[in-house]
Amino acid sequence: LEYHIEQGDKLDNADLDVGVVSGIVSVIRYEVTAKGMSNHAGTTMMVNRKDALVGMAKLIVAAEQRARELSDTLVFTVGKIAVSPGQENVIPGQAVANFEMRHMDKAVTDQFYADIQALAKEIPNCEFEFVNTSAKYSTPCDPRLIKLIDDVCTEKGISHIIMPSGAGHD
C-alpha cells in the first residue's frame, strides 16, 4: 500500500483530502502522420495548398473537442509534433504527432480512437496514418482494499473520493 501525492487537480478542485484509487487507467498512444505536399510558401496560392501541419492542427482541435464530449474522465494529449521539411519558407509536407489517451474503460478509448479516425477522413488536403506505439490497459484495484480505505476515511472523518489514478503508475 502506497501513499502518494495527487499529481493532478481533482482533489484540490473538490477540496478533498484523500483520493482512494479504484484502478489505474489505460494509457494508449499513437503516432499520427499527416501527409500533404511540400511546396514553396511564397509561390503556392492558398487554394492549392496541401499543408500537413494545418491538417494536423485541425485534427488535434477536433479530437480535443470530441474527448470533452465523449467522457468527462477521458484525457487526450498531444505532447510532441515534428514538421517536415521544417523550413519557414516551405509548406509542410508531413506532420507527425504523438496522440495519447487515458481512461479506465477500454470501450471508451476504443470509441475515441474510432472517432479520431473518422474525424481524420473529413479533413481535406491531407491523408492520415495511425500507428499504435503503446497500449497499457487499465488495472482495477482490489474492491476489498478500496472498501477498507473508504470505510476508514469515513470513520475518521477524512474527506475523500473514490477515483482512478490517471498517472498510470500508482
Model-predicted regions and their roles:
Residues A67-F76, I123-E127, C153-I158:
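Short secondary-structure junctions
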Residues D17, I116-Q117, R144-K147:
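Charged helix-capping and loop-helix junction motifs
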Residues F112-A120:
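Short amphipathic alpha-helices in soluble, non-transmembrane regions
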Residues T44-V47, Q111, P140-C141:
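Short, solvent-exposed loop/turn segments at secondary-structure boundaries
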Residues V90, V108-F112, I161-I162:
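Extended hydrophobic-aromatic, low-complexity segments
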Residues L1-A107, S134:
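Midchain, well-structured core segments that form catalytic/ion-binding scaffolds
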Residues E129-D170:
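An extended, acidic, His-containing surface patch that forms the Zn2+-binding/catalytic region
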